[in-house]
């Protein structure tokens, strides 16, 4: 996808962030800080097919990231 291409270029994916209602989000992708970008980035895939960047510092987004991390760490 477009995100993978940007990561290969070794720069941040998100140039700006957008505030959006959580109900419009289909999928969240958290990109950890690394050599390509010094900050954590959150890319949301919306139900209408668009991809936008969310502010990882926003309280609602922090909660969502926490949920993702917790669910990812659980053994099934």
From Swiss-Prot:
Keywords: Chemotaxis, Cytokine, Disulfide bond, Inflammatory response, Secreted. It is found in: Secreted. Alveolar macrophages. Its main location: secreted. The keyword Disulfide bond applies. InterPro entries: Chemokine_b/g/d, Chemokine_CXC, Chemokine_CXC_CS, Chemokine_IL8-like_dom, CXC_Chemokine_domain, Interleukin_8-like_sf. Gene3D superfamilies: 2.40.50.40. Pfam families: IL8 (PF00048). GO terms for cellular component: extracellular space. It comes from the Eukaryota. One of its GO terms (molecular function) is chemokine activity. Disulfide bonds join 12-37, 14-53. One of its GO terms (biological process) is inflammatory response. Has chemotactic activity for neutrophils. Belongs to the intercrine alpha (chemokine CxC) family. This is Alveolar macrophage chemotactic factor. It comes from Oryctolagus cuniculus.
